[in-house]
Amino acid sequence: MGRGGARATAEAQPLPSFCAGELGSLRAEGGTPAADRASWGGFRPSDRDRHSRALEQEEHSMDPRFSRPKSGGVLEMIGNTPLLPIRKLNPNPKVELWAKVEGCNPGGSIKDRIGLSMIEAAEEAGQLEPEMTILEATSGNTGIGLALVSAVKGYKLLLTMSEAVSVERRKILAAFGAEFLLTPGHLGTDGAIERAYDLADQQPDRYLLVDQYNNPANPLAHYHGTAPEIWEQTGGRVTHFVGALGTTGTVMGCSRRLKELNPEIRVIAVEPHLGHKIQGLKSLKEAYVPGIFDKRLVDQKVNVADEDAFATARLFAKAEGLLVGMSSGAAVFAALELARSLERGLVVLILPDFGERYLSTNLFTA
């Protein structure tokens, strides 16, 4: 699809029914990078330049190899998530607000996309042997996405994560058969990352560290999947994209693709404050800055406080009828503030997951 053609002729498009995944002519998916697109494995933050070169060498076009996951079954349910109109909370009648509901993925979050993408990239690169254990540091959702794909494909999975993650996430991981090691809560996500690096260094023949923070297959899942879905679902009318920063893969992949389709699209990244309690997000002021992050792909960065994210998640459930998670609350808060400042436009924001996996936390108790 050309940069300007769709925008010039598009009218308001009928949007899919909730969790139906009907996208008309587009049959995009979770985006599974092929081995010849990026060579990776055991990346560290110091590999930023090598990663940037890999992305710059990408063919910026829809590749038929990415049209659907190759593994069949439940994996074909990943992607093609619906857009939900935000009506009651929308503060500006001249601005359209739409939320992409990633909780409709089979594992319950947007991280199913990258779980499939990273594992299939490793397979195609010949880096994942049947006897190896997949290893990753996670705040929960990526672990669940990896656990789902590992269960389907028959791989062993070991995850490191902060003991501060919700009980629901631990139970879901156990149900999928994944093993996990908990790191001290006060160390946050960085503590889990360091533990995963140590394990991979100690036994490189045993573990394949997928390293979502530095793995090109992470943003490529969104470049080839999430972003084209947004473009098609809005008929090319999207003017602003709002996404929260965790690994930064969602924002990086969507920004790169959407700006190729229309360079005027503005990308707003939502970042928590240092010491935050928003599970799934990461402050770039922490020790590990993701190697996949490229500040040139962000037009504006907005910091959201914990209390604003949590209060907005509670308000969203009561006003819009959808129970969403902590990071979703942060994204909605930023999108509402953005809508107030615009004269007109069409804003798409990402809701990474649903709220059921946070019921043991204080998210919905205030």
Regions found by a protein language model. Give the residues of each.
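PLP-dependent amino-acid enzyme catalytic core
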Residues: 19, 42-44, 48-366
